[in-house]
Amino acid sequence: TGMQRYLDVSTQIYKTYLKYVSPADIYPYSIDEVFIDVTGYLPYYHMSAHELAMTMVREVLYNTGITATAGIGTNLYLAKLAMDIVAKHIPADKDGVRIAELDEQSYRYLLWNHRPLTDFWMTGPGTVKKLEAHGIYTMGDLARFSIYGEDRLYEIFGVDAEILIDHAWGYEPCGMAEIKSYKPSTNSISEGQVLTCPYPNDKAKLIVREMAEILICLLYTSPSPRDGL
């Protein structure tokens, strides 16, 4: 099936990354997206982060024909935004490859005035609605508000205010070791799709099967314990 092909190619791409870094330094964020901590590998390969990313992306393209996009950041949050927002607005090279980079300073320069706020990782519509009710429409607004209104942010968002403030300034205290060692209170995962119209039974069964295959892949690549599965 098309989904099986998708899973096979995703596995092949993951194996390509493993030629360059240890599994301990890769976190599968989704079936087609990973975080990779290359910090310790740059001296070994005598490459910059951009050069190493380009090397891996080129090999993925050669092996699979898939054009990968990469975001490079000084922390996980900035790497995610570099890929999700910045890379979409830069020209691709001759092979269609886009690689974008962010550090704290370039993040503030490039994205403090970016809208909508929902483009930012972990900033959903509900959070944005509350922020806009207080005149906060950009990450720059949020950063400036946090200087004098930090207590008010904690009143509105509780402990979640801390991560909002950190992200407004381009900080992310959570690193690869923390997300690898995180143990959720439950061991459940889920997959969902929003259908644009009613589906007949045969097509609905195909969608359910594809989602089940995605869950299988996530279980296989997840760093969480699998005892009892």
Residue ranges and their predicted role:
Residues 119, 127-222, 226-229:
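DNA-contacting surface of Y-family translesion DNA polymerases
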Residues 1-166, 176:
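Gly/Gly-Pro- and Ser/Thr-rich, intrinsically disordered tail segments characteristic of DNA damage-repair
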